[in-house]
């Protein structure tokens, strides 16, 4: 679609029945498989996209997407990322130097850096893989069917073992065992009468 607004560098291989919309840019040693949909303001650099992949408004650099996976909108694959079959990378997700196994999903607002994720894992909204200690990068491992709840921090190097369950809001600094639920957050407190006391304090406050 719209070849006048699309840039595909010479030598790029594109499979049959693949749709490339306007404003897409494909550079370098890239290959696009069959039956793909590449749309939005997507940029693909030195990357391989297998068959039946959907890319919507994403930046993909020196990475590999396997069959039936999808990414976007507004997502980014930084170098050395490998996205497995049927993996979903949603809006505002960034992946760097990491692998995601078949069926794993990261739907919203996550950073996955220097990590190896297995199959059928759920990465919740706002999850951050904390990979840098100020001097060195460290890797984390998340095994098959683990669940990482929203706003969790995975502080590398740690391992979440098979079917490990990390509760929302937790900061993980130690390994999580298989089938284990980890909750690491302050206990919720109920302070009765606070609002009325605050109103009175505000009323008596003098500028």
Model feature map: region roles:
Residues 1-70:
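Extended, small-residue-rich solenoid/repeat segments and analogous flexible loops
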């Amino acid at each position: 679609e719209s070849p006048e607004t699309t840039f595909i560098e010479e030598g790029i291989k594109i499979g049959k029945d693949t749709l490339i919309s306007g404003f897409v840019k494909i550079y370098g040693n890239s290959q696009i498989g069959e039956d793909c949909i590449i749309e939005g303001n997507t940029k693909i650099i030195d990357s391989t996209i297998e068959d039946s992949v959907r890319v919507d408004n994403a930046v993909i650099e020196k990475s590999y997407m396997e069959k039936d996976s999808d990414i976007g909108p507004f997502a980014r694959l930084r170098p050395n990322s490998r996205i497995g079959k049927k993996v979903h990378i949603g809006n505002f997700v960034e992946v760097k130097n990491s692998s995601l196994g078949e069926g794993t999903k990261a739907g919203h607002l996550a950073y996955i850096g220097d990590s190896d994720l297995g199959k059928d894992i759920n990465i919740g909204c706002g999850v951050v893989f904390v990979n840098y200690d100020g001097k060195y990068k460290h890797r984390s491992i998340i095994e098959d069917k683990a669940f990482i709840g929203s706003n969790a921090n995975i502080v590398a190097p740690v391992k979440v073992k098979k079917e490990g369950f990390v509760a929302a809001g937790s900061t993980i600094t130690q390994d999580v065992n298989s089938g284990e639920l980890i909750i690491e957050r302050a206990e919720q407190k109920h302070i009765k009468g606070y609002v009325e006391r605050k109103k009175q304090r505000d009323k008596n406050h003098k500028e």
